[in-house]
């Protein structure tokens, strides 16, 4: 079975690559130094410092593997294609909530870049998935864990 791609903007890929580089060069070295310092204290069988450093190392290596895996499947979003009038990954979408008339603007991104607080929602989220393929003036009903939302698309960029 082929794995699905990780959709990233150019900025998103650059951020993940920078994080990976930092983890591999700076963080690894710091943790190795912590482990070495704990070993110098003597008996490591009951050393809290040693155990903490080894746990930090395991978490770090897990994140490094995760980033490498994400980047190996990266498919860069063509931002020129995002402005076709149809909601796609990379589009910025302004919607109006039918229940109260409020408006919200989101950018549809891949799950690795999603950050709802920054207005970046995943194409795999209920709202993101419901908006994909839609156009201005389309009405969209979204089933979310907190209930049903009715939206009207006002702008697609």
UniProtKB/Swiss-Prot annotation:
Keyword Repressor: no
Keywords for the protein's UniProt record, in alphabetical order: Coiled coil, DNA-binding, Transcription, Transcription regulation
One biological process term in Gene Ontology: regulation of DNA-templated transcription elongation
Highest taxon, organism lineage: Bacteria
Ranges in a coiled coil: 47-75
A Pfam family hit: GreA_GreB
InterPro entries: GreA/GreB_C_sf (IPR036953), Tscrpt_elong_fac_GreA (IPR006359), Tscrpt_elong_fac_GreA/B (IPR028624), Tscrpt_elong_fac_GreA/B_C (IPR001437), Tscrpt_elong_fac_GreA/B_fam (IPR023459), Tscrpt_elong_fac_GreA/B_N (IPR022691), Tscrpt_elong_fac_GreA/B_N_sf (IPR036805)
Keyword Transcription: yes
GO molecular function: DNA binding; RNA polymerase binding
The protein's role, per its UniProt record: Necessary for efficient RNA polymerase transcription elongation past template-encoded arresting sites. The arresting sites in DNA have the property of trapping a certain fraction of elongating RNA polymerases that pass through, resulting in locked ternary complexes. Cleavage of the nascent transcript by cleavage factors such as GreA or GreB allows the resumption of elongation from the new 3'terminus. GreA releases sequences of 2 to 3 nucleotides.
Protein family membership: Belongs to the GreA/GreB family.
Protein name (Swiss-Prot/TrEMBL): Transcription elongation factor GreA
Source organism of the structure: Chloroflexus aggregans (strain MD-66 / DSM 9485)
């Amino acid at each position: 079975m082929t794995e699905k791609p990780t959709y990233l903007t150019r900025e998103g890929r650059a951020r993940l690559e920078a994080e990976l580089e930092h983890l591999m060069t700076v963080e690894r070295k710091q943790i190795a130094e912590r482990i070495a310092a704990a070993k110098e204290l003597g008996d490591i069988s009951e050393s809290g410092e040693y155990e903490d450093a080894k746990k930090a190392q395991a978490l770090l290596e897990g994140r490094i593997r995760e980033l490498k895996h994400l980047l190996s499947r990266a498919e860069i979003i063509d931002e020129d294609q995002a402005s076709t009038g149809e909601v796609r990954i990379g589009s910025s979408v302004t919607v109006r909530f039918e229940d109260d008339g409020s408006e919200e603007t989101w950018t549809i991104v891949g799950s690795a870049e999603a950050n709802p607080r920054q207005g970046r929602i995943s194409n795999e989220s209920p709202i993101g998935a419901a908006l994909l393929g839609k156009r201005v003036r389309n009405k969209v009903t979204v089933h979310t864990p907190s209930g049903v939302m009715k939206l009207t698309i006002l702008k697609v960029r």
